[in-house]
Amino acid sequence: ELVKLLFTYGDREIDIDGTDENNNPIIYKIIVASFIIDDLKNDDLLFKDETHRIIFEIYDKALDDGILPKQQFFVSHENAKIAELAANLLSSPYKLDNWEKKEIKVKTEEDVLSKLVITSVLRFKDMVLDEKRNELTKQIMETENIDDQIILMVKKKRLDDLRIKINHELGIV
């Protein structure tokens, strides 16, 4: 989902709620690619899939250079896996009919882009945390040393607390 958002809306601006230096609520604008890349880098999160990781690195470098790649760059990329992924993610088999004639407003991805981007980043983080929790659980079961088990359980508790926070933000109980 994050790669699709980068391909489709990477160069678009979204509004993000934040606070200023006096802790007053503000809304600031940020480029979608910048929000996704910076947020994942800030938490030292990487994609497991090599193709996704390469795309992440391309966007990271492009942000440093100040020039974001266009969709065509990925569709015609020399790496066949990137080109295929781009073509698949950018082609949608669905098209909304013109509901305005019937006075029915249908929300598109663009209408809820800020929320979609934030939710997708949080879901990715939740998925990564879940994988790390599962690894720690396995290590706890395999470790015979009680002191090592306690250290692993403390790490798992921190991950559990992070997951609870993320799930709260996602509205998941």
Regions inferred by a protein language model and the residue ranges of each:
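Short amphipathic alpha-helical surface patches that mediate protein-protein
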Residues: 60, 75-80, 91, 141, ...
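Non-catalytic protein-protein interaction segments used by genome-maintenance enzymes to assemble
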Residues: 1-67, 71, 86-87, 91-96, ...
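Amphipathic alpha-helical segments at domain termini/boundaries
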Residues: 67-125, 130
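Short, small/acidic-rich helices and loops at N termini and domain boundaries
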Residues: 48, 54, 63-66, 106-173
